[in-house]
Protein backbone atom coordinates (compact mmCIF):
# COMPACT_ATOMS: atom_id res chain seq x y z
CA UNK A 1 0.00 0.00 0.00
CA UNK A 2 1.02 3.58 -0.55
CA UNK A 3 -0.18 4.81 2.83
CA UNK A 4 -1.84 2.81 5.61
CA UNK A 5 -4.73 0.38 5.19
CA UNK A 6 -7.21 -1.86 6.94
CA UNK A 7 -8.61 -4.63 4.74
CA UNK A 8 -12.00 -6.28 5.20
CA UNK A 9 -13.57 -9.45 3.84
CA UNK A 10 -17.33 -9.96 4.02
CA UNK A 11 -17.63 -7.18 6.58
CA UNK A 12 -14.89 -8.42 8.92
CA UNK A 13 -11.43 -6.93 9.36
CA UNK A 14 -8.96 -9.61 8.24
CA UNK A 15 -6.49 -9.03 11.10
CA UNK A 16 -5.92 -7.19 14.35
CA UNK A 17 -3.04 -5.28 12.75
CA UNK A 18 -3.13 -1.47 12.82
CA UNK A 19 -1.01 1.11 11.01
CA UNK A 20 -0.26 -1.41 8.28
CA UNK A 21 2.14 -1.53 6.55
CA UNK A 22 4.91 -0.42 8.85
CA UNK A 23 7.22 2.42 7.88
CA UNK A 24 9.57 1.85 5.00
CA UNK A 25 11.60 3.91 2.58
CA UNK A 26 8.93 3.84 -0.13
CA UNK A 27 11.37 4.81 -2.86
CA UNK A 28 13.26 1.55 -2.14
CA UNK A 29 10.57 -0.98 -1.21
CA UNK A 30 6.84 -1.51 -0.81
CA UNK A 31 5.89 -3.81 2.06
CA UNK A 32 3.18 -6.42 1.76
CA UNK A 33 1.48 -8.61 4.35
CA UNK A 34 0.01 -12.10 4.07
CA UNK A 35 -3.17 -13.20 5.86
CA UNK A 36 -5.01 -16.51 6.06
CA UNK A 37 -8.67 -15.73 5.26
CA UNK A 38 -10.16 -19.14 4.41
CA UNK A 39 -12.50 -19.08 7.43
CA UNK A 40 -13.88 -15.69 6.31
CA UNK A 41 -14.94 -16.92 2.86
CA UNK A 42 -18.29 -18.51 2.11
CA UNK A 43 -19.87 -20.17 -0.93
CA UNK A 44 -21.08 -17.71 -3.56
CA UNK A 45 -20.32 -14.01 -3.70
CA UNK A 46 -17.69 -12.60 -1.32
CA UNK A 47 -16.82 -8.91 -0.83
CA UNK A 48 -13.41 -7.41 -0.07
CA UNK A 49 -12.72 -3.78 0.78
CA UNK A 50 -10.04 -1.53 2.23
CA UNK A 51 -9.89 1.79 4.07
CA UNK A 52 -6.81 3.89 3.33
CA UNK A 53 -4.96 6.59 5.23
CA UNK A 54 -1.98 8.85 4.49
CA UNK A 55 0.42 7.13 6.86
CA UNK A 56 4.14 7.60 6.46
CA UNK A 57 3.76 7.65 2.68
CA UNK A 58 2.04 11.03 2.31
CA UNK A 59 1.33 12.19 5.85
CA UNK A 60 3.22 14.72 7.99
CA UNK A 61 6.70 13.41 8.78
CA UNK A 62 10.18 14.39 9.82
CA UNK A 63 11.79 17.40 11.40
CA UNK A 64 10.43 19.68 8.70
CA UNK A 65 6.88 18.39 9.30
CA UNK A 66 6.43 18.15 5.55
CA UNK A 67 3.75 16.19 3.69
CA UNK A 68 3.89 13.99 0.61
CA UNK A 69 7.47 12.89 1.24
CA UNK A 70 7.07 9.87 -1.03
CA UNK A 71 3.97 10.74 -3.07
CA UNK A 72 0.65 12.53 -2.97
CA UNK A 73 -1.86 9.76 -3.68
CA UNK A 74 -2.68 6.79 -1.45
CA UNK A 75 -3.05 3.44 -3.20
CA UNK A 76 -3.78 -0.15 -2.28
CA UNK A 77 -3.19 -3.46 -4.06
CA UNK A 78 -4.49 -6.85 -2.99
CA UNK A 79 -4.01 -10.33 -4.33
CA UNK A 80 -6.27 -13.12 -3.11
CA UNK A 81 -5.12 -16.62 -4.01
CA UNK A 82 -7.89 -19.20 -3.85
CA UNK A 83 -6.86 -22.86 -3.59
CA UNK A 84 -9.73 -25.24 -4.28
CA UNK A 85 -10.20 -28.76 -2.89
CA UNK A 86 -9.01 -30.28 -6.19
CA UNK A 87 -5.75 -28.28 -5.96
CA UNK A 88 -6.57 -25.76 -8.68
CA UNK A 89 -5.76 -22.13 -7.98
CA UNK A 90 -7.43 -18.87 -8.86
CA UNK A 91 -5.97 -15.42 -8.27
CA UNK A 92 -8.14 -12.35 -7.73
CA UNK A 93 -6.45 -8.94 -7.86
CA UNK A 94 -7.47 -5.36 -7.27
CA UNK A 95 -7.88 -3.37 -10.45
CA UNK A 96 -10.18 -1.14 -12.47
CA UNK A 97 -13.29 -3.16 -11.51
CA UNK A 98 -12.93 -1.97 -7.90
CA UNK A 99 -14.99 0.97 -6.72
CA UNK A 100 -14.33 3.63 -4.11
CA UNK A 101 -16.22 6.16 -2.03
CA UNK A 102 -15.45 8.85 0.50
CA UNK A 103 -14.95 7.22 3.88
CA UNK A 104 -16.15 8.59 7.22
CA UNK A 105 -12.49 9.01 8.25
CA UNK A 106 -11.96 12.35 6.51
CA UNK A 107 -8.58 13.16 8.08
CA UNK A 108 -6.04 10.70 9.39
CA UNK A 109 -2.50 11.52 10.47
CA UNK A 110 -0.17 9.38 12.53
CA UNK A 111 0.89 12.29 14.74
CA UNK A 112 -2.21 14.49 14.50
CA UNK A 113 -5.12 12.12 15.07
CA UNK A 114 -8.23 11.50 13.09
CA UNK A 115 -11.41 13.33 12.07
CA UNK A 116 -14.53 11.22 11.59
CA UNK A 117 -17.74 12.30 9.84
CA UNK A 118 -20.51 9.90 10.93
CA UNK A 119 -22.77 11.26 8.16
CA UNK A 120 -20.54 9.42 5.67
CA UNK A 121 -20.91 6.02 7.35
CA UNK A 122 -22.05 3.05 5.29
CA UNK A 123 -22.64 0.41 7.99
CA UNK A 124 -22.33 -2.63 5.71
CA UNK A 125 -19.91 -1.18 3.16
CA UNK A 126 -17.62 -4.22 3.04
CA UNK A 127 -20.38 -6.81 2.80
CA UNK A 128 -21.98 -8.23 -0.31
CA UNK A 129 -24.29 -5.81 -2.05
CA UNK A 130 -27.06 -4.55 0.20
CA UNK A 131 -29.22 -1.44 -0.25
CA UNK A 132 -27.25 0.29 2.55
CA UNK A 133 -23.85 -0.02 0.88
CA UNK A 134 -24.84 0.85 -2.68
CA UNK A 135 -26.62 4.23 -2.62
CA UNK A 136 -26.89 5.70 -6.10
CA UNK A 137 -23.99 7.96 -7.00
CA UNK A 138 -22.00 7.15 -3.86
CA UNK A 139 -19.52 4.70 -5.39
CA UNK A 140 -17.26 5.43 -8.36
CA UNK A 141 -14.53 3.70 -10.35
CA UNK A 142 -11.14 3.82 -8.69
CA UNK A 143 -8.10 5.36 -10.35
CA UNK A 144 -5.50 2.68 -10.90
CA UNK A 145 -1.80 3.43 -10.61
CA UNK A 146 1.19 1.34 -11.64
CA UNK A 147 3.48 0.04 -8.94
CA UNK A 148 7.00 -1.31 -9.23
CA UNK A 149 6.57 -5.04 -8.55
CA UNK A 150 10.35 -5.35 -8.20
CA UNK A 151 10.19 -3.26 -5.03
CA UNK A 152 7.67 -5.53 -3.25
CA UNK A 153 9.00 -7.06 -0.03
CA UNK A 154 7.33 -9.08 2.72
CA UNK A 155 7.01 -7.14 5.97
CA UNK A 156 9.53 -8.71 8.34
CA UNK A 157 9.19 -6.33 11.30
CA UNK A 158 6.63 -6.81 14.04
CA UNK A 159 3.11 -5.55 13.60
CA UNK A 160 1.21 -2.89 15.53
CA UNK A 161 -1.83 -4.16 17.47
CA UNK A 162 -4.15 -2.52 20.00
CA UNK A 163 -2.84 -3.14 23.53
CA UNK A 164 -5.38 -1.12 25.52
CA UNK A 165 -8.51 0.92 24.84
CA UNK A 166 -8.88 4.14 26.80
CA UNK A 167 -12.41 5.57 27.04
CA UNK A 168 -13.01 9.20 26.11
CA UNK A 169 -12.76 11.59 29.05
CA UNK A 170 -14.90 14.34 27.57
CA UNK A 171 -16.91 15.38 24.53
CA UNK A 172 -17.19 19.06 23.66
CA UNK A 173 -18.00 21.44 20.84
CA UNK A 174 -14.99 23.28 19.40
CA UNK A 175 -15.18 26.97 18.40
CA UNK A 176 -15.62 25.94 14.75
CA UNK A 177 -18.74 23.93 15.69
CA UNK A 178 -17.21 20.48 15.33
CA UNK A 179 -17.60 17.87 18.05
CA UNK A 180 -14.36 16.78 19.72
CA UNK A 181 -14.02 13.50 21.61
CA UNK A 182 -10.98 13.64 23.88
Q: How would you describe each model-predicted region?
A:
Residues 1-118, 182:
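Accessory beta-strand-rich segments of carbohydrate-active enzymes
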